[in-house]
Amino acid sequence: MVVTVYLLIVYDVGVERVNRVKSYLRTELHWVQNSVFEGEVTESQFRRIETNLERIIDRERDSVIIYSFRSERAMNRNVLGLEKSPLDVIL
């Protein structure tokens, strides 16, 4: 049985690394808004995402926060104002 987790990733990284982080996360998760991605992944994908982000960021200057939930249903998501990228839109 494949175990999945729902991730919410927010980041604040140096301007010289923003595009690398954003481009990488777009291959793995759904873009929500500036510096925020979310989506369901397997545990092995989760580990790969963490490893690849570690390779991109500068631990002395950058910040990446990863929230993990058992499922999307375990997370209450309430958007105030403009929703920049609704998750129900398929690209």
Curated annotation (Swiss-Prot):
It holds the Pfam family CRISPR_Cas2. The keyword Nuclease applies. Keywords: Antiviral defense, Endonuclease, Hydrolase, Magnesium, Metal-binding, Nuclease. It comes from the Archaea. InterPro entries: CRISPR_associated_Cas2 (IPR021127), Virulence_VapD/CRISPR_Cas2 (IPR019199). GO terms for biological process: defense response to virus; maintenance of CRISPR repeat elements. Its EC number is 3.1.-.-. It is an enzyme of class 3 (hydrolase). GO terms for molecular function: metal ion binding; RNA endonuclease activity. Mg(2+) binds at residue 12. Homodimer, forms a heterotetramer with a Cas1 homodimer. CRISPR (clustered regularly interspaced short palindromic repeat), is an adaptive immune system that provides protection against mobile genetic elements (viruses, transposable elements and conjugative plasmids). CRISPR clusters contain sequences complementary to antecedent mobile elements and target invading nucleic acids. CRISPR clusters are transcribed and processed into CRISPR RNA (crRNA). Involved in the integration of spacer DNA into the CRISPR cassette. Functions as a ssRNA-specific endoribonuclease. NCBIfam families: cas2. This is CRISPR-associated endoribonuclease Cas2. It comes from Methanothermobacter thermautotrophicus (strain ATCC 29096 / DSM 1053 / JCM 10044 / NBRC 100330 / Delta H). The gene is cas2.
